[in-house]
């Protein structure tokens, strides 16, 4: 990655063509090729492949199962297994959908997209307000930002670099296909804040586990998690509205609904860190609860526990 003043821009390197990465390029080529087929044809096929891959990915499946058992203890083992299967199906469908958007562009793609809460975006544009979208970790998480960038909005987001440099290069190139800025989490949050203050629409994912030092333990579904209560600070420093957003893909209708919810400003403006953390988790619950298969449950979301509790992912 090549570093510029306040952003990272993907940079191709010759060693990406070495034999060690040939299989990666083959898989990426397959994804690009499959994205050219109509969703009505490819989605059922991708669902079967995704569920099959999910059965083989034992470690990832185990993490997802642990997360779901803690968050939804009222569900049966069978119900949770169905969610995990559907999650892996959604994952592959979303990756291919992102490739389709990057290759074919947004014109036809947008015909299969519905913005629920579009009036909120229009009000932001009308008032020329700074905004940070609070976006739970869904499989289609990059697509709304790409669509907004394609509409001419300046977007800024933070990202984690992938272990495979070819995947990292391609993925971040796709994210920037229609413009916008990417900020590495390794550089801290200041470059992201700077972009928001410059009028970029921020894109913040709130649900990663950052450890106990700066986090607050707050209720999360039926359990709790260590949540970094940073959005209050981001709102104040960036003078930005905090707008929840979450994409949901319907594999049967082949339609993406992007839900935009009213600003969180009123409920966090005077709240302490513990209340802010709870409001963040509550927002994730509202957006994800009715569509759990859309969420990336394979993350170690609940790794940080209270002092008397063991790591749930031994």
From Swiss-Prot:
Catalytic activity: an alpha-Kdo-(2->4)-alpha-Kdo-(2->6)-(acyl)-lipid IVA + a fatty acyl-[ACP] = an alpha-Kdo-(2->4)-alpha-Kdo-(2->6)-lipid A + holo-[ACP]
Broadest EC class assigned to this enzyme: transferase
Coiled coil feature spans: none
GO MF annotations in UniProt: acyltransferase activity, transferring groups other than amino-acyl groups
Transmembrane segments: 17-37
Pathway, per record: Glycolipid biosynthesis; KDO(2)-lipid A biosynthesis; KDO(2)-lipid A from CMP-3-deoxy-D-manno-octulosonate and lipid IV(A): step 4/4; Bacterial outer membrane biogenesis; lipopolysaccharide biosynthesis
Broad class of where this protein is predominantly found: membrane
Induction and repression of expression: Induced under limited magnesium growth conditions by the PhoP/PhoQ two-component system.
An annotated GO BP: lipopolysaccharide biosynthetic process
Subcellular location: Cell inner membrane
Phenotypic effect of disruption: A msbB1/msbB2 double mutant is impaired in its capacity to cause TNF-alpha production by human monocytes and to cause rupture and inflammatory destruction of the epithelial barrier in the rabbit ligated intestinal loop model of shigellosis. Mutants have no defect in their ability to enter into epithelial cells.
Keywords: Acyltransferase, Cell inner membrane, Cell membrane, Lipopolysaccharide biosynthesis, Membrane, Plasmid, Transferase, Transmembrane, Transmembrane helix
Membrane topology field: Single-pass membrane protein
InterPro entries: LipA_acyltrans (IPR004960), Lipid_A_MsbB (IPR011921)
Gene Ontology CC entries for this record: Gram-negative-bacterium-type cell wall; plasma membrane
EC number: 2.3.1.243
Annotated S-S bridges: none
Span(s) of short sequence motif HXXXXD motif: 137-142
NCBIfam families found in the cross-reference section: lipid_A_msbB (TIGR02208), PRK08943.1 (NF006507)
HAMAP family: Lipid_A_LpxM
Family stated for the protein in its record: Belongs to the LpxL/LpxM/LpxP family. LpxM subfamily.
Function: Catalyzes the transfer of an acyl chain from an acyl-[acyl-carrier-protein] (ACP) to a Kdo(2)-(acyl)-lipid IV(A) to form a Kdo(2)-lipid A.
Protein name: Lipid A biosynthesis acyltransferase 2
Origin species: Shigella flexneri
């Amino acid at each position: 990655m090549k570093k510029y003043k306040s952003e990272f821009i993907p940079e191709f390197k010759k060693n990406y063509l070495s034999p060690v990465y040939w299989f990666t390029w083959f898989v990426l080529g397959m994804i690009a090729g499959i994205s050219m087929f109509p969703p009505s044809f490819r989605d059922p096929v991708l669902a079967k492949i995704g569920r099959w891959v999910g059965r083989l990915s034992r470690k990832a499946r185990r993490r997802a199962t642990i997360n779901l058992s803690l968050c939804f203890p009222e569900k049966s083992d069978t119900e949770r297994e169905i969610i995990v299967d559907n999650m892996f199906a959604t994952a592959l469908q979303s990756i291919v959908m992102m490739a389709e958007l990057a290759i074919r562009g947004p014109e036809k793609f947008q015909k299969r997209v519905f913005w629920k809460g579009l009036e909120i975006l229009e009000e932001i544009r009308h008032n020329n307000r700074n905004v940070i979208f609070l976006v739970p970790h869904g499989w289609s998480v990059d697509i709304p930002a790409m669509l907004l960038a394609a509409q001419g909005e300046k977007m800024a987001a933070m990202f984690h670099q992938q272990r495979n440099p070819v995947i990292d290069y391609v993925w971040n190139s796709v994210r920037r296909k229609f413009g916008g800025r990417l900020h590495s989490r390794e550089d801290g949050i200041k470059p992201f804040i700077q972009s928001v203050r410059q009028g970029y629409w921020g894109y913040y994912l709130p649900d990663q586990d950052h450890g106990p030092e700066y986090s607050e333990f707050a209720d999360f579904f039926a359990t709790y998690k260590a949540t970094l209560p940073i959005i209050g600070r981001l709102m104040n420093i960036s003078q930005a509205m905090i707008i929840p957003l979450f994409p949901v893909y319907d594999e049967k209708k082949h339609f993406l609904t992007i839900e935009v919810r009213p600003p969180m400003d009123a409920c966090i403006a005077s709240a302490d860190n513990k209340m802010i953390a709870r409001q963040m988790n509550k927002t994730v619950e509202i957006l994800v609860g009715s569509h759990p298969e859309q969420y990336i449950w394979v993350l170690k979301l609940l790794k940080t526990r209270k002092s008397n509790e063991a790591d749930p992912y031994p």
